[in-house]
């Protein structure tokens, strides 16, 4: 779990991993506006923060169902392909379920996020407020049946509109 001492370290990690500062600014804004649900870090054996992920609330057709959006997910380049992102995501999913969050969405590469169990959100009748590439908007039921009987447009926290 993110600790106060991790905030600036996470900011530096995100700025080093992504092409622009947009993700770092997003995380800072979500944190400042209390729109983050879960923020986890992965550390090296030496205690260096080498990975980070964050979840924030989303709505379906303007209604809160305790669903979450995963963004961003980052691992330092020299630590990639070692299962760090997988561990972060699995730990996060377990924590989200423990706290009563039954479903999650993500916007990203289907081949990558499919490894974690995400499927095209359209299979669940869900769409994103933004125009995104086919298959990039994905969803997962953390609790079986959580998305059943729901359909419509997913909106992220307002901070995402600044990306």
Model-identified regions with their sequence ranges:
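Short loop segments at secondary-structure junctions
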Residues: 44-47, 78, 141-146
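C-terminal "cap" of GNAT-fold acetyltransferases
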Residues: 3, 127-163
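Conserved glycine-rich acetyl-CoA-binding loop
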Residues: 48, 76-87, 99, 115-116
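A short beta-loop-alpha structural element at the N-terminal edge
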Residues: 1-10
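A conserved beta-turn-beta hairpin within the catalytic core of GNAT-like acetyltransferases
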Residues: 58-70, 80
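Conserved active-site alpha-helix within GNAT-family acetyltransferase domains
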Residues: 98-102, 107-133
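Active-site rim helix/loop that mediates acceptor-substrate recognition in acyltransferases
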Residues: 7, 15-59
């Amino acid at each position: 779990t993110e600790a106060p001492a991790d905030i600036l370290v996470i900011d530096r990690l995100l700025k080093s991993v992504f092409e622009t500062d947009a993700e770092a600014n997003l995380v800072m804004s979500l944190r400042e506006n209390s729109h983050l649900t879960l923020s986890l870090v992965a550390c090296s054996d030496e205690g260096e923060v080498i990975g980070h992920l964050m979840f924030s609330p989303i709505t379906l057709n303007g209604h809160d169902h305790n669903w979450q959006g995963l963004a961003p997910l980052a691992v330092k380049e020299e630590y990639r392909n070692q299962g760090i992102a997988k561990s972060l995501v699995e730990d996060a999913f377990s924590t989200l379920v423990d706290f009563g969050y039954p479903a999650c969405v993500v916007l990203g590469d289907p081949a990558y996020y499919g490894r974690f169990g995400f499927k095209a959100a359209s299979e669940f009748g869900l769409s994103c407020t933004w125009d995104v590439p086919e298959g990039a908007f994905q969803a997962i039921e953390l609790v079986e049946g959580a998305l059943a009987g729901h359909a419509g447009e997913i909106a992220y926290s307002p901070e995402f509109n600044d990306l």
